[in-house]
Amino acid sequence: MSRKRTSPNRNVQIADQIQRDLSELIMREVKDPRIGIVTIQSVELTPDYAHAKVYFTALTGDPEKTQEALNHASGHLHNLLFKRLHIHTVPTLHFHYDQTIEKAVEMSRLIKEANSTRAKDDDEAGAPAQDD
């Protein structure tokens, strides 16, 4: 007897639904003062739906304290998701601060700095600055 595999598309659909539901539930149901304005960036599910990595950004507040508070509230959020989702297994939630935005800003700053240094070096050498 062959086991039925879950399709990658279904995994993405469930992850997207969890992302939408968590965004709403955190805003309306979680009353922890350590949690400021939070945006759920993405949700990654294990193939068996047992665990979900939930990546968030925090517009206000300390990201570490926010992560701690969200992980503390994960059991409550799990129960609320169970009432909303119509799937057999609702995953255990693991919250992680998403540093993608900060890393992108830092990379942009480094690129600008490198370009301005290169232009300055070209000007000092008497060669025209090149645009790539």
From Swiss-Prot:
Subcellular localization(s) per the UniProt record: Cytoplasm
Gene Ontology CC terms, in alphabetical order: cytosol
Claim: S-adenosyl-L-methionine is one of the keywords in the record: no
GO molecular function, a single term: ribosomal small subunit binding
GO biological process: maturation of SSU-rRNA
Any Pfam family matching the protein: RBFA
Keyword set, alphabetical order: Cytoplasm, Ribosome biogenesis
Recorded family membership: Belongs to the RbfA family.
Subunit structure and binding partners: Monomer. Binds 30S ribosomal subunits, but not 50S ribosomal subunits or 70S ribosomes.
Function: One of several proteins that assist in the late maturation steps of the functional core of the 30S ribosomal subunit. Associates with free 30S ribosomal subunits (but not with 30S subunits that are part of 70S ribosomes or polysomes). Required for efficient processing of 16S rRNA. May interact with the 5'-terminal helix region of 16S rRNA.
Protein name: Ribosome-binding factor A
Source organism of this protein record: Burkholderia vietnamiensis (strain G4 / LMG 22486) (Burkholderia cepacia (strain R1808))
